[in-house]
């Protein structure tokens, strides 16, 4: 079942009316965070923008140097300090903020490819670890005016996750192995850190 976008959009409008600006959507890999965030921004229209956490992936060369390339997507494979700094600048609402965007066709973040305008009414940021209580990551939650946790049944989420990896070049066997070894441990971290969400959205 898909979340009721009309009800969610109403909640977002109430958030902005109260003076809120930054909405965070957390969830496990494959839960549908990007899809929901994009739908909200498109439904809002002019005045809403995305700020995806995925743009702060460390580069593959850096992951190789740190010997973390075999678990890309884990909390310590992101530039969490850069993400927190970007959110902090967005919250000050004083100037446009340039942020990176993750290009899945390249499996790399492209610096300065998204501009969050100072005039933007609503900024929707989404990612796995927005509610994670860990060094660096615990600084994210205070920067969100509201935080949602998107939850999907594993029977729906895992096959979609495998299909995504296959679509980006992995064999079915390799995709399933990656999901089991990397994505599912990350999903467990997300589930364990869900207590600070203002709203749980199920699909």
Residue ranges and their predicted role:
Residues 42-50:
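Post-Walker A helix-loop "phosphate-sensing" segment adjacent to the P-loop in P-loop NTPases
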Residues 112, 135-138, 166-203:
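Small-molecule kinase domains that catalyze NTP-dependent phosphoryl transfer to phosphate-bearing small molecules
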Residues 36:
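Hydrophobic positions on the alpha1 helix immediately C-terminal to the Walker A/P-loop
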Residues 106-164:
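ATP-dependent NMP and nucleoside kinases share a basic, alpha-helical "lid"
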Residues 33:
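Conserved lysine of the Walker
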Residues 52, 59-106:
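Conserved nucleotide-sensing/catalytic segment adjacent to the nucleotide-binding pocket
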Residues 39:
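Active-site signature of alpha/beta-hydrolase-fold catalytic machinery across serine-
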Residues 1-24, 28:
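Extreme N-terminal, non-catalytic leader segments
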């Amino acid at each position: 079942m898909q979340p009721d976008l009309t009800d969610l959009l109403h909640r977002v409008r109430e958030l902005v009316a109260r003076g809120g600006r930054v909405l965070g959507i957390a969830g496990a890999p494959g839960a549908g965070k990007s899809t929901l965030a994009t739908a909200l921004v498109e439904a809002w229209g002019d005045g809403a923008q995305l700020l995806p956490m995925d743009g702060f992936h460390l580069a593959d060369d850096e992951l190789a140097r740190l010997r973390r390339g075999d678990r890309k997507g884990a909390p310590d494979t992101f530039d969490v300090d850069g993400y927190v700094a970007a959110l902090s600048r967005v919250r000050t609402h004083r100037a446009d903020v340039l942020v990176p965007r993750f290009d899945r066709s390249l499996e790399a973040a492209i610096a300065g490819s998204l501009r969050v305008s100072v005039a933007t009414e609503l900024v929707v940021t989404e990612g796995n670890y927005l509610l994670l209580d860990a060094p660096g990551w615990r600084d994210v939650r205070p920067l969100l005016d509201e935080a949602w946790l998107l939850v999907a049944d594993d029977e729906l989420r895992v096959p979609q996750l495998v299909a995504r990896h296959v679509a980006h070049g992995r064999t079915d066997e390799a995709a399933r192995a990656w999901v089991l070894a990397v994505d599912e441990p990350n999903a467990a971290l997300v589930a364990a850190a869900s207590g600070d969400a203002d709203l749980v959205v199920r699909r």
